[in-house]
Amino acid sequence: MPVSVAVCETTNVVNAALRESLGVGIGSGGASSDDKSAGEDTNSLQNHIVANAKRILMTKIEYEEVPNYQEAVLENLKSKYIVIKPTNPTNGCNLNGNTANTFGNKNNAGKIVGANGHDNNGRKLSDHPNQNHNHANPNGHHANPNELPKPKRVLYPRENIRIGWKQSERKWQVGSGMINAGNTCYLNSTLQALFHIPALANWLVSEQAHMENCNVSESGSFCIICAMAKTLQATQTTQSAVRPFLIYTKLKQICKHMIVGRQEDAHEFLRFLVEAMERAYLMRFRNYKELDQLVKETTPLGQIFGGYLRSEVRCLSCNHVSITFQHFQDLLLDIRKSDSLEEAFEGYFSREKLEDFGYKCEGCKKKVSATKQFRLERAPITLCIQLKRFSMMGNKLTKQITFKPRIDLSKFAARSPAASVQPLIYRLVSMVTHLGVSQHCGHYTAIGSTEAGSYYNFDDSYVRPIAIQSVCNTNAYIMFYELDPLQTSSPAAARANGLRLTNGHGPVPVAVPATVSSPLPSPAKFIGPQLPPGGINGYSNGHGPKTTIQFKPQHQPSHQQNGVQQSAKSPLLSTHVKVEAAAGAAALAASAAPTANGNKSSSNHSNHKSVNQQHYLPISSEDEDSEDEVKARPTVQLPSMPKMDDCMDSGKPKSPVKTPVKTPLKSLVPYESASEEEEVVPLPNPNARKRSSDSSDSEHEPTTSSVQLNGHSKTNGSLSNGSSKSTDAIDEIFKSLKGYQAKKKSADSEDDDDDEDEPNNQLTNGWHPQKQSQSQSRSGPPSPKTPPSPAVIKSKTGIWKVTRDDGDDDEDDDDDDDEVVEEARAVRTPVKNHRNPFASSKTATDSPTTPGAKRQKLLNGSAIKTQQQPRAGNGYQSEATANGGTVNELLKQSHRGYSSSVLSWNGKPAELEKEPFVLVCAKRIAGHGSLDGSGSGSNTDIIDTEIPAAAVNFPSGSCSFSLLADARDQRQRDLADDEENEMDRGRQRKVKSGSAKISNSTPGYNPFMEFENQKRWHKNGGGGGFPRFYQNQNFRQGFQQRNKFKFNRFGGPGSAKFQQQRALQRHLAAGGGFTRRQPTHSAQQQQQQQS
């Protein structure tokens, strides 16, 4: 509203008052601000204006709409005044008379500074990053509301804070203890923690000049800064424990509700103590009450402990972001859902959702749902952290929180273009611990660091050194971390900006081990969350614990030094990036252990490459292996590392490996092992860890060379189009068992064709034949009637033997005595499909095999077998004959009496379901009779033919026939009553309901307990006919009501009650039910008459 309208209407009144005041000569009295009564000077200017004030206020002001206030009103006012050119003051004072803060910028001298740190042109002073260059903006711009405002005045520059013990000129001692004056452990521990903060201690020592000229103590008041400085000096100069009387005698002045001798909270005392020191520092300034909040936050305590949080509230409707800044001096971390300090920081700075429709958006102008997130806009020099261990009810959360002596808060800093690249590293300097179970009781101690870097425990007057491991395992309550000055990249730059005044976040450099050196420029790095060793699905870049996802350039020659090789291949090409959730891939990533010196765990995942489209993937362990050069391996080999032959050339085609294992290995890894490097087998191929599908996806080569890695063969080439598919080992066994009979019929013809088609002993389905035994001739294959040895499958649940349920075993085993026990057999090593180990694939009948050769069991993925060598069964298989007929027959039988029928692998009923019970018992006894004392079967094979029970030779006649009879009776008893079997299995027996029904609704009534108690009471057949002790019927009814499950314990055999009980017993013994006994008056009267 234009004020000139009202002024113009009252011009005459004001002019008359001025003339009268000047004429009388009392103008000075009218200009003074002293309060005078109306009767002293009625002719004063003040009295004239007050008298006409009512008239001025009652004057009607008419409003007019103008298009522009600047042109309509201000231009008219300018014509009535003379504009005098202002002169810039040379002392740098602003309009309020306060000294302007130039923040160390000499170019800003002589400028009037506004409220937000701007000059007259509206340009921020912080926009001059270089002191020697002043980039002027002719147009100027207003303050950015999304940036932290600048204070008009800085009471204590941030650059004057000295960080670290080395910044001081004096020699710092460990410090003496403090005497407990009576429940003052909270005070002693807090003071010790503050005195061992280098920044605060250096500032207190620098206040020596203030202590000499301090006039607060002379006036009878209290200066807490002087008291803290004197107490610190006493702990440094005194060898014995000191008494901090300067602090606890003035406890009422620090906090009004604190009482000496009463237990208090250490964090509460800390906050009141810091606030009292800030007030004492502000009292040094004459107009400290008129200072705004931003200026009050520039005290030395605010510069040391103070920081700013950036709060971003994002509207979920219009995505409007509201940014505010909040000053803090400590961070209160919630540890209820955290186990470490890093997790607590993650939860504090994570994005949280506000209450639904509880935030009024500035853009939508309505209440909407929003999210809120904190960021570090300006990190403090000393970070104070309080763990929320106490609740409002006084209970304490005593969980252990793990923390480190150094923490990095760079990822929580607010990102800005002018951010510094130096990391935000803090180191632990002191802490306060609490021993106790609640807030109302316990003991406080302190831990502080010294100039030498060691830590000491301060328990009141006791001071003792403590190891860093013990420090990290303490039950911390308050922790003080100080900014590490050694982590600054440039001391001059750190000094200029006050050690991260902007606290921005830039790219964090990744530490590379010294063993890797390359003259080429480093590839582009991925800035973001880093993966742990192993990564996704076993990917690892071999850089130790610091795993960074990197992107490879398209062409980069390889460089090798100290046994660590960098990748030089082209980047991985893929049309789509897929994370397969197959069981084999999950097991591979779960148990893949990282190895040292550049040896990584292998991951065999299929890669579908596309030349037209390029997609960058993280560097994996397979990509670091060169295809053209041999990687130099260290001489030391771990058990989980494959032994590579350094002298082999990977460019030459490899011949089949025919070196057998000298000693049978017993592995503790299941068959589907996550790592193929468990067995220490000398391998000549250094590129054996390449993916099996690399060559199949590329151009097909005519050579069919194969390389075996720890018993697993890998195909580098293929002759047919359909032979390159991987077949799972378990599916291969299942389908080979189903088609076993069909393969035996065409054995002779297909065997000859197989020898001609495979010159390099490489089968098209991925099975690789091994060295044959001497007893086998190439011209004459072994008899197809030789039963195969049971295949062993090792899984996570244990070892399983595969048995077949075909009817040809009984016929084929008749002439088994004429056959040689140890025959040559083709070792079939499957090429595992890591995308899906249980995926369906081609059966074994698709490829020509040698059906005359026996199938060798797949144990631990190893397919190595020599002549007359016992099988390594991992402790679960007896080293008997190769056919294993006894164990095979025992495993085919099911436990009928204990559980449901066990089906065979192909889903058919076992032999026990089809054969007579007598024949099974005979075969079982015959099998036990053929075993020697060591538990291994003899050379005489037990075949599966139908043997009459009379033709079996038993060790002892009476014992064997009794065993048959007992087994037959047991089987009849099992099939007789199904309910009894259910009782044997531990299930609850169902109560039979006969003539009587259970009609008792009493809670907790148990008919079984009542029946058992009845038998126990009358086990002697009843006692003598004792008379009734209680003749009162009403009392007897109450007694029976209280003792519901008790009967007449003293009635004779001839009493009616006893006869009634015996009848109930006979009824229950016959399987009938019963109801609860209802006492009647007629029965009791009859019993009393008989007595």
From Swiss-Prot:
Q: Where is the stretch described as Disordered?
A: 115-152, 523-572, 594-892, 972-1007, 1068-1091
For the modification Phosphothreonine, which residues carry it? 659, 663, 786, 829, 850
CDD domains, sorted? Peptidase_C19E (cd02661)
- Tell me a GO biological process for this protein: germ-line stem cell population maintenance
Stretches of Basic and acidic residues bias are at: 643-652, 691-702
Q: What is its main location?
A: nucleus
List its EC numbers. Answer: 3.4.19.12
Which residues, renumbered to this chain, carry the PTM Phosphoserine?
518, 522, 673, 675, 749, 783, 789, 847
Which UniProt keywords are present, listed alphabetically? Hydrolase, Nucleus, Phosphoprotein, Protease, Thiol protease, Ubl conjugation pathway
- Where the record annotates domain USP, the positions are 176-484
User: Would the keyword Flavoprotein turn up in this protein's UniProt record?
Assistant: no
Query: What reaction(s) does this enzyme catalyze?
Result: Thiol-dependent hydrolysis of ester, thioester, amide, peptide and isopeptide bonds formed by the C-terminal Gly of ubiquitin (a 76-residue protein attached to proteins as an intracellular targeting signal)
Q: Where in the cell is it found?
A: Nucleus, Nucleolus
Q: Which domain of life is it from?
A: Eukaryota
| One GO CC term on file | nucleolus
**EC primary class:** hydrolase
InterPro entries per record: Papain-like_cys_pep_sf, Peptidase_C19, Peptidase_C19_UCH, USP_CS, USP_dom
Query: For this protein, what is any one GO molecular function term?
Result: K63-linked deubiquitinase activity
Mark out the compositionally biased spans (Pro residues). Answer: 781-790
Assembly description: Interacts with atms/PAF1, but not with CycT.
Q: Which family does it belong to?
A: Belongs to the peptidase C19 family.
Name used for this protein in its record: Ubiquitin carboxyl-terminal hydrolase 36
> What phylogenetic lineage does the species belong to?
Eukaryota, Metazoa, Ecdysozoa, Arthropoda, Hexapoda
